[in-house]
């Protein structure tokens, strides 16, 4: 387990594949700038538009480059239980430290089916599992009562909670906060979730402000709560601008503006609207990230 900031890393693409040279640079940059853990092939990494072979290669490559300096978390969950198991087994084989398993989307399963999905994956592997709750994308919510039940599975050790509902997070902490680590899945709720006993954040903002996102968490853990809150508020407008369109469109655009060679988005994601690009650029300039 880790405490602090886990970057939900973008995947740098070429026109027809993954830019591994740039991926290596990004991994090293994050380690240098005190990112506490690295998630690959997640939502921000455009995992849904990567082929199975691309995902396997990115996971393997990232594990090898990072070489245990920080934990590497592999986004292996899909709405297909069998496919999720296959990729999770592969991540375990190549040395990933944890897998991130999203709630199954589109299928519209029941709570019984949701539990069966996670239970089947849990029983098939021997690697820690971080659940991913993001109802706005999946149409499926992990309720506090369901999390309390899932926390009894031996490999389920954490949840990325992106419902945006702090009352729900509080109930989760009350029911099973002693058995499962809760990470904020929203950059505007890092400090509120830390105040409920959270362990950190899985962050989009960390793609462009790795050390600063780490510091929000670190200062809180050191008891410097006001300083942590002030950093949260300092970067709030910038964080919000990264969601002015569907993630990861703005953050990948921002990184290219910052002279990272992250390449194109993959369809059906496309370039930002001009009016939103102006807002993003203004926020990047205000924080000294571009001129």
From Swiss-Prot:
Its EC number is 4.3.3.7. It is an enzyme of class 4 (lyase). The keyword Nuclease does not apply. The active site is at 132 (proton donor/acceptor), 160 (schiff-base intermediate with substrate). It catalyses: L-aspartate 4-semialdehyde + pyruvate = (2S,4S)-4-hydroxy-2,3,4,5-tetrahydrodipicolinate + H2O + H(+). It holds the Pfam family DHDPS. InterPro entries: Aldolase_TIM, DapA, DapA-like, Schiff_base-form_aldolases_AS, Schiff_base-form_aldolases_CS. PROSITE patterns: DHDPS_1 (PS00665), DHDPS_2 (PS00666). Keywords: Amino-acid biosynthesis, Cytoplasm, Diaminopimelate biosynthesis, Lyase, Lysine biosynthesis, Schiff base. GO terms for cellular component: cytosol. GO terms for biological process: diaminopimelate biosynthetic process; lysine biosynthetic process via diaminopimelate. One of its GO terms (molecular function) is 4-hydroxy-tetrahydrodipicolinate synthase activity. It is found in: Cytoplasm. Pyruvate binds at residues 44, 202. Pathway: Amino-acid biosynthesis; L-lysine biosynthesis via DAP pathway; (S)-tetrahydrodipicolinate from L-aspartate: step 3/4. The record marks 43, 106 as: Part of a proton relay during catalysis. Homotetramer; dimer of dimers. Belongs to the DapA family. Catalyzes the condensation of (S)-aspartate-beta-semialdehyde [(S)-ASA] and pyruvate to 4-hydroxy-tetrahydrodipicolinate (HTPA). HAMAP family: DapA. This is 4-hydroxy-tetrahydrodipicolinate synthase. It comes from Clostridium perfringens (strain SM101 / Type A). The gene is dapA.
